[in-house]
Amino acid sequence: MNSGKINQQFGLSHLTNSIFSTLNVADTTDYLALKQANMRECLILIDGMGQDAVNKYGDQFPIFEELKNVRTIYTNFPSTTATSLSTLGTGVLPGVHGMLGYTVRVPRSDNRLLNALKWDERVDPVMWQKVPTLFERAVLTGVSVTHVAAKRYEGSGFTQAALRGAKYVGANGIEEMVTAISSALVAQPSFVYTYLNTLDSAGHSDGVGSDKWLTALAQISEFITKVKESVPTGTRIWITSDHGMVNSTKQIILGQDNDLLENVLLIGGEPRARHIYINEGAQEETVAKWRQFLGNSAKVLSKSEAIADGLFGPVVSEDASERMGDLIAIANDDLIIIDPARVKEESSMVGHHGGVTDIDVEIPLLLT
């Protein structure tokens, strides 16, 4: 997909705005034209379950035949968990919420990267991501909002930044999660958000379509079935994802048989969506060099080009601009661009995401 058009598609911000609109939360928009109010809403987020994967493997599991396929929706750039869940949680695009990728430079630091999923205690999550979440706004209007996910995510910097405001119920394992979800939906009006990462983990380690990945999808199928059977009557259950996943067969290691590290201060982002921070005064030269070397294998943009192109949305806050790479490289096809300091970790993974190919950005929107 054209990187400049990705934010013009129906995405996660449209979905959560629509859901909270049916719960009568102020200043939300019903982009799905659901029209009627609903008192119980459940949103299941399956990390790494792209539309392409559902098309190829969903028919092996009966629950995917039973669900209504509402439409294909799209992640924003970069197509990665930290950015997508922030868009889902806030209802605004990345240029506004400022969560621009897996790792970005902390402004006015000693060239320190913030890993959004692991966080850094020196960074205040509420100051880093200042936009009130839809969860916070819904609670203020009297909606019971519950976040059901693994216990390890409770209170994390990322949870506080992107998904704050909900009552967090830590639950490990299918049965515990199903019980927590059904209990939380007794209240009216109520909203439950739940997150599972097993499919993403299997895709990274073994690849989409691998035995490990199919086992994870079978467990997810079982989970959705049990949630459907256990929730109170009248609950609407939405199922979506944060990105797809590409099985990579091609790689470039920065600085190996190339001079792409010349004038580079810091490597951020991830293998399919790089934020590159450059020595002052060398930006134009470095962008030209990367563009010439990578050719059609990646799209290379300067910061100003990325902003003008609408890569992170039509509005880019000052905070977002400061965090953005001086150069942004978006891998095409199934290429990955590897940080030489992380060769073992990055090259050992089969599945990757972050780019703007259809496989990266197209995700399903399913409804019980």
Where are these regions (language model features)?
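Feature captures the catalytic ectodomains and active-site-proximal regions of enzymes
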Residues: 1-368
